[in-house]
A protein has these predicted regions:
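Helix-to-loop junction immediately C-terminal to a conserved catalytic motif
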Residues: 8
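Conserved ABC transporter NBD signature motif
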Residues: 16-26
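ABC ATPase NBD coupling module
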Residues: 25-43, 73-74, 189-190
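Conserved signature/switch motifs of ABC ATPase nucleotide-binding domains
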Residues: 95-98, 116, 148
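Catalytic Walker B motif of ABC-type/P-loop ATPase nucleotide-binding domains
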Residues: 121-124
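H-loop/switch region of ABC-family ATPase nucleotide-binding domains
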Residues: 156-157
């Protein structure tokens, strides 16, 4: 989670670099212009949805388009309706967050991310606050996005999802990268002892 927040400049990194669109950025010292430029190409789906309680599902999706991107309201509404339809929430566009289940709120949050047409979506443990049944509906939306070619960086403990949908896995523990590689290599031929221990627990 901390790494993800540093990559989106929600927290300041102590050091390190990030390469985005062939541009290498010093994460400890990033000009505001660079932050704004990169954020326009990314979207963030939070663990606890982060929806505005006083706005409908539709308004939650249009807010960033109208306020952040200065888009005309009619165009923002059209894009928002399309995004809500994509996540199966078009019939709940006039509902407030309090009227939606956790899974439905997270799908609205994903629609909000899709609406800005990002190059990459960051997901911060998007199912950790959900019960198993609601987790399934959110993962189904994410699988569909993956199959459509959306680039996603996902912090997750959903190992089945990671195994079937990812093309690259990074296993971290206590802020340190333990192992990384292709999904196939990671799950079928792990190299590090700690990775093998972790996967053994998961497989049991």
């Amino acid at each position: 989670t901390t790494l993800l927040r540093c990559l989106n400049f929600l927290e300041k990194a102590d050091g390190g670099t990030m390469t985005f669109d062939d541009e290498t950025i010093d994460l400890h010292k990033v000009p505001k212009r660079t932050i704004a430029r990169i954020r326009k190409k990314t979207a963030f789906v939070f663990q606890n949805y982060n929806l505005f309680a006083n706005k409908t599902a539709l308004q939650n999706v249009t807010e960033g388009l109208i306020v952040g991107r200065k888009m005309p309201k009619d165009e923002a509404n059209r894009i928002a309706h399309e995004a809500l339809k994509k996540v199966g929430m078009e019939d709940r566009s006039d509902y407030y967050p309090s009227q939606l289940s956790g899974g439905q709120q997270q799908r609205v949050a994903i629609a909000r991310a899709i609406a800005v047409n990002p190059e990459i979506i960051y997901f911060d443990e998007p199912t950790s606050a959900l019960d198993p049944e609601l987790t399934v509906e959110v993962l189904a939306v994410m699988k569909r996005l993956a199959q459509e070619g959306m680039t996603m960086l996902v912090v997750t403990h959903e190992m089945n999802f990671a195994r079937t949908e990812s093309n690259r896995v990074i296993f971290m523990e206590k802020g340190v990268v333990v192992e990384q590689g292709s999904s196939k290599e990671f799950f079928e031929h792990p190299k590090e002892t700690r990775t093998k221990e972790f996967l053994r627990i998961f497989q049991e």
